[in-house]
Amino acid sequence: MAESTTLARPYAKAAFELARDAGQLSEWSALLALTAAVAGDSNMHKVLNHPALTSAQKGQTFLDVCEGKLNEAGANFVRVLAENNRLVLLPEIAALFEQLKAQQEATIEVTIESAFEMNDEQENKLAQALQKKLSRNVNLRSQLNKELIGGIVVRAGDLVIDASVRGRLAKLAEAVNS
């Protein structure tokens, strides 16, 4: 994982700089999401790892699957990745691109796990509180997790706030056992 991130980072940065300079961050985001989905497909994974195919053949097969949904710059990006045998890194490249885009737009992806379904008012209040705390715009995504028993777990980048009953019970059990 760490190695693939290291290999993917320069490609993600290059794609980001190209997209930013062209004013096409959203277009490139969609383009990379598409190519990441194609690269993540199990059949395409077999093609990309097939030893008998040349990198040019792998790249052309990949472009054929995308069926003209890529602009010229996107197709060239795929060709460069194919030449360097890096098409399998597209999911990682797309994820790193999204991180760079979020930094540029001063936004952060926040995942909220809650034991019970949250209504819109609760989500809005939580989003406002997180925006104030993090000094960034927040894209909130909520998930239901009955295992929490009660409360919520907030994940924003490397920040984790565990305000769940399960988390409190785990801390209590740890304190009792030590």
UniProtKB/Swiss-Prot annotation:
UniProt xrefs under InterPro entries: ATP_synth_OSCP/delta_N_sf, ATPase_OSCP/d_CS, ATPase_OSCP/dsu
Q: What does this protein do?
A: F(1)F(0) ATP synthase produces ATP from ADP in the presence of a proton or sodium gradient. F-type ATPases consist of two structural domains, F(1) containing the extramembraneous catalytic core and F(0) containing the membrane proton channel, linked together by a central stalk and a peripheral stalk. During catalysis, ATP synthesis in the catalytic domain of F(1) is coupled via a rotary mechanism of the central stalk subunits to proton translocation.
What does the record say about its membrane topology? Answer: Peripheral membrane protein
Describe the family membership recorded for this protein in Swiss-Prot or TrEMBL.
Belongs to the ATPase delta chain family.
**Gene this chain is encoded by:** atpH
Q: Which UniProt keywords apply?
A: ATP synthesis, Cell inner membrane, Cell membrane, CF(1), Hydrogen ion transport, Ion transport, Membrane, Transport
For molecular function, the Gene Ontology terms on record are: proton-transporting ATP synthase activity, rotational mechanism
Where does the record say this protein resides?
Cell inner membrane
| Official protein name in the record | ATP synthase subunit delta
Q: Where are the transmembrane segments?
A: none
Recorded GO cellular component terms are:
plasma membrane; proton-transporting ATP synthase complex
Family matches, as Gene3D superfamilies: N-terminal domain of the delta subunit of the F1F0-ATP synthase (1.10.520.20)
Q: How does it assemble?
A: F-type ATPases have 2 components, F(1) - the catalytic core - and F(0) - the membrane proton channel. F(1) has five subunits: alpha(3), beta(3), gamma(1), delta(1), epsilon(1). F(0) has three main subunits: a(1), b(2) and c(10-14). The alpha and beta chains form an alternating ring which encloses part of the gamma chain. F(1) is attached to F(0) by a central stalk formed by the gamma and epsilon chains, while a peripheral stalk is formed by the delta and b chains.
**Species in which this protein is naturally found:** Hahella chejuensis (strain KCTC 2396)
